[in-house]
Amino acid sequence: MNVLILAALVQVQATAVREVSLGKVDRVVSQDFTQIRGLRELPDGRVLLSDRLDKGVVVVDFGTNSVRVIGRTGRGPAEYKLPTTLTALPGDSTLLSDEGNSRIAIIGPDLKIHRSLNVMLPGGSMAMGARSIDTQGRFYLQIPAWMSNPQSPNANDTIPIVRFDAKARKVDTLLRLKGMSWLPPGPRYGFGWVVFAPQDVWTVTADGRIAVVRSGDYHVEWYEPSGRVVRGAPVRFERIPVTMEERLAYVREFLDNSMISGRGEEGSMSPIPAEMKDEKRVREMATRNTFAEMKPAFTDGALIQGPDGTLWVERSIRLGETPLWDVFDGSGKHVARVRLPAKRQLGGVGAHHLYVIATDEDGVQHLERYSR
């Protein structure tokens, strides 16, 4: 039975949130992709998409089943290397994270790259990755533990979210959240943090509202530009044990999505080569690293914003289960739960459609569109 998600959002029960599944695929783009990392629906219904390893940044047109490349791979103006997230900015512009060049880029409404820049905080020596830019040109970013507490970066897992005014050289701390659970300094094989330990996640809307999903009792908070904070009710969740198979799956995914320095052109960042991802190394990393006993309520993946003001949060699931997403409204209320088909991942949310990434047995990805 084809159950529309929009109907579920309207017909929410006061006592329980309904779980709905996607209906039939509306459209599929025939173009192959390798590693889709960012997606944003444009006002005219086309989709801006970033393929981190292969196609670069492209405009996808479902109506004509076509793909057009924006910019090109490189280190110069209007170029990028390993493009990742795409975030809506005021005025129909888009913020692109250029991971390979350690910078960000601004894509205008004309779908051209107008500017690439590094965000450097006062007194800092390393470029930072901004989550968003508001109408006044101020950057929103997360300060890592090694920078916010350089004397004892592993002492606690609380990190600040700041707003940086580059013109005034002013940094304002807006809130704090629970970050990764870092391990004490010392030699180790692999991760320096406790894998699957609960941590808060956040995002910023184009109008400057900050959404935070708190990991303690799993609830959503909205921080308004005026300073007003709106908190939703806690959401019940299942405690899922972390098995050895879960550990192995995590390590494989981590290596597939990680970078290594000195292997790319001119010593730049590049994907980890296959010889460093053999089964023996994967199992050794899964055995020797520190994992939490239970999975958190939700993953540490990026939050997805809907143009209707909804916030989409990916739930933790058991290995082998299909992806599950919770939907919250602008007040932090839990309004829906959406189950995806197998081998699918939610890429983006549009006004009338959901965009889903389908991955086949060979790791090839295709972009699917479903009606909301």
Predicted regions and their residues:
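Eukaryotic scaffold repeat domains enriched in small/polar residues
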Residues: 8-372
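Sec-dependent signal peptide recognition
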Residues: 1-7
